[in-house]
Amino acid sequence: MTWRVLVHNDAINSFAAVAYALVRVLSMPVEHAAAAARQAYESGVAEIGAYTEREPAEAITARLQAFGLNASIEVAA
């Protein structure tokens, strides 16, 4: 089973705030963080990671939520 971590577009966080949180929480390269933030902004959601264990996905989701992002996990189909 694969657990996907998703970031959703919202009316609160700016593009820059989303990219910043992805860099800080995931140590994601700035270019990748900007691309993920743009995808969330344009399509409403961006997958930022996929994990074979539920616990790491939940931990990352909680950290993103602590930054104020609208993040969730789902089981990949």
What kind of region is each of these model predictions?
Residues M1-A77:
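Terminal domain-initiation and capping elements
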